[in-house]
Amino acid sequence: MFKGSIVAIVTPFKNGAVDEEKLRELVEFQIENGTDAIVPCGTTGESSTLDYEEHDRVIEIVVEQVKKRVPVIAGTGSNSTKEAIEMTSHAKTLGADGALLVTPYYNKPTQEGLFLHYKAVADAVALPQILYNVPGRTGVNLLPETVARLAEHKNIVAIKEATGSLQQASEIIDLCGDKIDVFSGDDFITFPMMACGAKGVISVTANIMPKEVAALVDAFFAGKMEEARQWHLKLLKISNAMFIESNPVPVKTAVALMGKCSAEVRLPLAPLAEANKVKLVAIMKEYGLI
């Protein structure tokens, strides 16, 4: 259903508010450079510090601007199942083509709790849903066996696997077969994950290098393995630089250095440390981005 290079797009701010004009420009930048789908209100979009009105508005703007040219997959996850259902339902009403739901964080549900949470959302909202497993941020790991149970649900179509573990990704692909699509949640591991059967990436790096991330994925699916491998190696340094501090601080700084929006992030996120900014600038210059 979804495939290729999918960007987890940043949410630009200006004087504390969502910068709607810059958000529209960022959407155009992505589509013009070959991005296959757009995820607003993910981790990279600072969903955790958007209020409900802003969250809905960001999704609405992206849907409006995209005009059905590529799928829009709205971030609608929550650690409250009731809230996740409401947000996913509203995303559908706004015209989103799918939803990305992070595992419930902080309250640390069991595997059965995770299963029941996702099943409840999928039962309640007839919209294609992507599970999102990122234990480094949530404190809970959605195990392959649980993913396999959820893959039986018609509305659960994919998983963004961001453990950084090829073993876990491979186990999901092996257990689920064609019942669910797997996407890399870490740019540095996209190529090897696709070699194991992943269908693409939900990317941070694509915020600044959409054409190149798309080239990696497109080369792989065109059977041009050596070209894809070379793109993987070429993008490795810049992809790692996106995590010199907590995402999305480095990538938003990078987008700002390219003149595309402000570097403003919301507390408790802080601006990129000056020493890390110096490193980031040097790496971006190597890539000809600034």
UniProtKB/Swiss-Prot annotation:
Main subcellular location: cytoplasm
Function: Catalyzes the condensation of (S)-aspartate-beta-semialdehyde [(S)-ASA] and pyruvate to 4-hydroxy-tetrahydrodipicolinate (HTPA).
Coiled-coil segments: none
GO CC terms: cytosol
Name by which UniProt lists this protein: 4-hydroxy-tetrahydrodipicolinate synthase
Residues of the site described as Part of a proton relay during catalysis: T43, Y106
Catalytic activity: L-aspartate 4-semialdehyde + pyruvate = (2S,4S)-4-hydroxy-2,3,4,5-tetrahydrodipicolinate + H2O + H(+)
Assembly and binders: Homotetramer; dimer of dimers.
This protein's encoding gene: dapA
Active site: Y132, K160
Record-listed pyruvate binding positions: T44, I202
